[in-house]
C-alpha cells in the first residue's frame, strides 16, 4: 500500500538517520530512492532490488528496518485515532487553539493532523534578519523538540508494555483491530492519559520559556532588531499561544528578602551571595583587556608562513619578549669618590669666584685682560732695548754705540736738508666734484615732453614734404569718423566702420609690439637686479664690525647669513663665549640695510636655549648685565676686501680667534671688540 506525502515526510528523518548509521555517512540519493520505494507501495523484494546498487550487502537489513518502521508508523496512527477527540480538547485548554475546535464542531470530517505536526494555516510571520539570535528558539528547533518528546513517549510505552502484561479485554468489534497490532504498541487508557499529560506539561513549559525569552528581548529592541518577532511567529505556527508576560514586571528588580539575622535569602529560605560591584580605575580595566587580548593571541593558531611566496626560512623572527636584565653591582666606595670629586670641584669654583670678585673691585682684572689683548713682544716687560724702533732706520747694522763721539757720516740719511716724505695718493678720491641732478617740476616735464614730440613730428613732416616717405594714413577713430571721411561714411557706413576698427586694431598691435620689444628678458632682469645690489667698490670698501653677546640661536645665524648673501656682502662671524664678532664688507647701501637688520630688526634680547640655564644660577644683577644685545664696534672704509663669502668660525679660545683674524690681516678688529667687551664687563 502506497503512503501519502505527509507520511513520507514523517518517515524521512528516520530514513536519513538509518542511512547514516548503515553507510557511515549521509547520502541524499539513498534517502530519495527509499522514499520512492515506500511511496510506490513496493514489497520487500522489489525494494531490495531497487536499493541494492546503493547499499550492496546491507540492502536486506536496511529494507527490513524500513518496512518495520512503516508498519510501526501505521499501527501508531490507528491506535491514536480513538483518543484523538479528547487530545484535541486538552490541547485547546492548554494552548487556546480555537480554530481547530471550531472546525471539529462543525461536523464536517477534516484531514487528521498528528499531535505535533505544523498547522496548514500559518499566521503571518514578521520578516526578520536571516541569522537567528542564539538565545531564541527557531521554528525548526521547536519542531525537533516536539519530535523528541514524541519519541520519548513511544519508548516509554514500549518499556511499560514489556514490564506489565496487557489486561485481558473482551473481544469487541472496536477492539479487534488493536489485538492484531504488535504487543509493543498496545497501551492502556490510563497510561495514555499520563503520557498525554506529560507531553502537555512539557509543551506548556517550552511555551513559557519562549515567552520569557521574547519578553527579555523586547526590553532591548536595538540588540537584535526585529529578529525577536520571528520566534513568536514560529510559536503561533506550531499552534502554541505563549502566555503574555508583562514588561513592567520584568523591569522591576527582584525583591530583597532578609532573614532574622539580616542575611539575604531566596524564596526557599536558602542564603544567597549578592554580587558586589565596586568602582575601579580605567588602568585596571585596560590591564584586564590587555590580558584577555594576550590570551586570545596565544589561543589563536599560528599562520602557515611556509606556504607564503615571500617566506624566507633563513630569516629568523626576533622574539617579542623583553630580554631580562642582569644585576650590576657597584664597587664599594664608588659613590663616595664621586661625591668627593663633586665637593672638590665646587670648592674650586667658589675660590675662583672669590678671586675674580676681588680682582674686579681693585681693577687688576681689567688691566690684566687688556694687557693680554696686546700682541706679544720679543722683550720682556721692563727691559730697555739697545736701539729704539725710531732710531733703527738711521743707524746701520753693526754700528758700535760705545764710541763717545761718533762721526756724522757714520749715520745713514742725516743731512742738512729737510726731508719731505713722498706723497701717496689716497685710496679713495674724495676730491671729485659731485654734480647734483636737476629735478624738474611736473609742469616743466610736460612742457619738455611736448617740445620733444613736436620736434619729432616736424622731422616726419619734412620727410613727407621732400618725398622721402609716404604720407601716413589719417588717424581715424569712431569719434572723428564723419569729419575725416565725409561722403564715404555716408555712402557705406558699415564698410567705413570696419575699416576704422581695423586701423584701430593695427595701431593697438603696433603699440603692444613696441612695448614687448622694449621689455627686458628674464635674464636681463636678473642681471639688472644683481647690478643694482652689487655696488661699485672700486673707490673703497665699506666695513662694519658688530659685537654680539650670544649668537647661539640658529634662527639669528640664518638671518645674518641669508641677508649677507642677498646683499652681496662678504665677511666673517667668529663665535666665542660672550664675544661674537660679525665683520661685513660691501657697498654703502648694502651696509645701511645690514646695519638696520643688526641693530633694529633682530630682537637680540629674546631668551635663547643656551642662556636659559645660566640665568637661573646667576643673580638678578648679573642677569641684567648679561642681557643679549648687539653693538656696533666700528665702521669705516678700506682699500680692498679682507674676507670672502660670509662664513661662521667657532673659536673656543681668544688666541684662536685672534689668529683667525690675523690670517686675513684684520686682527685689530678682534682686539677692538674684545677690549670693549672687557671694559663693559667691569662696569
Curated annotation (Swiss-Prot):
Gene Ontology terms: biological process: mRNA splicing, via spliceosome; spliceosomal tri-snRNP complex assembly
Cellular compartments annotated: Nucleus; Nucleus speckle
Chain residue ranges for the region called Disordered: 73-135, 153-183
Region named Mediates interaction with SART3: 416-550
Modified residues (Phosphothreonine): 167
Ranges of compositional bias, category Basic and acidic residues: 73-107
Modified residues (Phosphoserine): 164, 619
Presence of the UniProt keyword Ubl conjugation in the record: yes
Crosslinked residue numbers (Glycyl lysine isopeptide (Lys-Gly) (interchain with G-Cter in SUMO2)): 139, 244, 252
Principal location: nucleus
Subunit composition and interactions: Component of the precatalytic spliceosome (spliceosome B complex). Component of the U4/U6-U5 tri-snRNP complex, a building block of the precatalytic spliceosome (spliceosome B complex). The U4/U6-U5 tri-snRNP complex is composed of the U4, U6 and U5 snRNAs and at least PRPF3, PRPF4, PRPF6, PRPF8, PRPF31, SNRNP200, TXNL4A, SNRNP40, SNRPB, SNRPD1, SNRPD2, SNRPD3, SNRPE, SNRPF, SNRPG, DDX23, CD2BP2, PPIH, SNU13, EFTUD2, SART1 and USP39, plus LSM2, LSM3, LSM4, LSM5, LSM6, LSM7 and LSM8. Interacts directly with PRPF4.
Primary role: Plays a role in pre-mRNA splicing as component of the U4/U6-U5 tri-snRNP complex that is involved in spliceosome assembly, and as component of the precatalytic spliceosome (spliceosome B complex).
Record's protein name: U4/U6 small nuclear ribonucleoprotein Prp3
Organism: Pongo abelii
Amino acid at each position: 500500500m502506497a503512503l501519502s506525502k505527509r507520511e513520507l515526510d514523517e518517515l524521512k528523518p528516520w530514513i536519513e538517520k538509518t542511512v547514516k548509521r548503515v553507510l557511515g555517512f549521509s547520502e541524499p540519493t539513498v534517502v530519495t530512492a527509499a522514499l520512492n520505494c515506500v511511496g510506490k507501495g513496493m514489497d520487500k523484494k522489489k525494494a531490495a532490488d531497487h536499493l541494492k546498487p546503493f547499499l550492496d550487502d546491507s540492502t536486506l537489513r536496511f529494507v527490513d528496518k524500513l518496512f518495520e518502521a512503516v508498519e510501526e508508523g501505521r499501527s501508531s496512527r490507528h491506535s491514536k485515532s480513538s483518543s484523538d477527540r479528547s487530545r484535541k480538547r486538552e490541547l485547546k485548554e492548554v494552548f487556546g487553539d480555537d480554530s481547530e475546535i471550531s472546525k471539529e464542531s462543525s461536523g464536517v470530517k477534516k484531514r487528521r493532523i498528528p499531535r505535533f505536526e505544523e498547522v496548514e494555516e500559518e499566521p503571518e510571520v514578521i520578516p526578520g534578519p536571516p541569522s537567528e539570535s542564539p538565545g531564541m528558539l527557531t521554528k525548526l528547533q521547536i519542531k525537533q523538540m516536539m519530535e523528541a518528546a514524541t519519541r520519548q513517549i513511544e519508548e516509554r510505552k514500549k518499556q511499560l508494555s514489556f514490564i506489565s502484561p496487557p489486561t485481558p479485554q473482551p473481544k469487541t468489534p472496536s477492539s479487534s483491530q488493536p489485538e492484531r497490532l504488535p504487543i509493543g504498541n498496545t497501551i492502556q487508557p490510563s497510561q495514555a492519559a499520563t503520557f498525554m499529560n506529560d507531553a502537555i506539561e512539557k509543551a506548556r513549559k517550552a511555551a513559557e520559556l519562549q515567552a520569557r525569552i521574547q519578553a527579555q528581548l523586547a526590553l532591548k529592541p536595538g540588540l537584535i532588531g526585529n529578529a525577536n518577532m520571528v520566534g513568536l511567529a514560529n510559536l503561533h505556527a506550531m499552534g502554541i499561544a505563549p502566555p503574555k508576560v508583562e514588561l513592567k514586571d520584568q523591569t522591576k528588580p527582584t525583591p530583597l528578602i532578609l532573614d532574622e539575622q539580616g542575611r539575604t535569602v531566596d524564596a526557599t529560605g536558602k542564603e544567597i551571595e549578592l554580587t558586589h560591584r565596586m568602582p575601579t580605575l580605567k588602568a585596571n580595566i585596560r590591564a584586564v583587556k590587555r590580558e584577555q587580548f594576550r590570551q586570545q593571541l596565544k589561543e589563536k593558531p599560528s599562520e602557515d608562513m611556509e606556504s607564503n611566496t615571500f617566506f624566507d626560512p633563513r630569516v629568523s623572527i626576533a622574539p617579542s619578549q623583553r630580554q631580562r636584565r642582569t644585576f650590576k653591582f657597584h664597587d664599594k666606595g664608588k659613590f663616595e669618590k664621586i661625591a668627593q670629586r663633586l665637593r672638590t670641584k665646587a670648592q674650586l669654583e667658589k675660590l675662583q669666584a672669590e678671586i675674580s670678585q676681588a680682582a674686579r673691585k681693585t681693577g687688576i682684572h681689567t688691566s690684566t685682560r687688556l694687557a693680554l689683548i696686546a700682541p706679544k713682544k720679543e722683550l720682556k716687560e721692563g727691559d730697555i732695548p739697545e736701539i729704539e724702533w725710531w732710531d733703527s732706520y738711521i743707524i746701520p747694522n753693526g754700528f758700535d754705540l760705545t764710541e763717545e763721539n761718533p762721526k756724522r757720516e757714520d749715520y745713514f740719511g742725516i743731512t742738512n736738508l729737510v726731508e719731505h716724505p713722498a706723497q701717496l695718493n689716497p685710496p679713495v678720491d674724495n676730491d671729485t666734484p659731485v654734480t647734483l641732478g636737476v629735478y624738474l617740476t611736473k609742469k616743466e616735464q610736460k612742457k619738455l615732453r611736448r617740445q620733444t614730440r613736436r620736434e619729432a613730428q616736424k622731422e616726419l613732416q619734412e620727410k613727407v614734404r621732400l618725398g622721402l616717405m609716404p604720407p601716413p594714413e589719417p588717424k581715424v577713430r569712431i569719434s572723428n569718423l564723419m569729419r575725416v571721411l565725409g561722403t564715404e561714411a555716408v555712402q557705406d557706413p558699415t564698410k567705413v566702420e570696419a575699416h576704422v576698427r581695423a586701423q584701430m586694431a593695427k595701431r593697438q598691435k603696433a603699440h603692444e609690439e613696441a612695448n614687448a620689444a622694449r621689455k627686458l628678458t628674464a635674464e636681463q632682469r636678473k642681471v639688472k637686479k644683481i647690478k643694482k645690489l652689487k655696488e661699485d667698490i672700486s673707490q673703497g670698501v665699506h666695513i662694519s664690525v658688530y659685537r654680539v653677546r650670544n649668537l647661539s640661536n640658529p634662527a639669528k645665524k640664518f638671518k645674518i647669513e641669508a641677508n649677507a648673501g642677498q646683499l652681496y656682502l662678504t665677511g666673517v662671524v667668529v663665535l666665542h663665549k660672550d664675544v661674537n664678532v660679525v665683520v661685513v664688507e660691501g657697498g654703502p647701501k648694502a651696509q645701511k640695510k645690514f646695519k638696520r637688520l643688526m641693530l633694529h630688526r633682530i630682537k637680540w634680547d629674546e631668551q635663547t636655549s643656551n642662556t636659559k640655564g645660566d640665568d637661573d644660577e646667576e643673580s638678578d644683577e648679573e642677569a641684567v648685565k648679561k642681557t643679549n644685545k648687539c653693538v656696533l664696534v666700528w665702521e669705516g672704509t678700506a682699500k680692498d676686501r679682507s674676507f670672502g663669502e660670509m662664513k661662521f668660525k667657532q673659536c673656543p679660545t681668544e688666541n684662536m680667534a685672534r689668529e683667525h683674524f690675523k690670517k686675513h690681516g684684520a686682527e685689530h678688529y678682534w682686539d677692538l671688540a674684545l677690549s670693549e667687551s672687557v671694559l663693559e664687563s667691569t662696569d
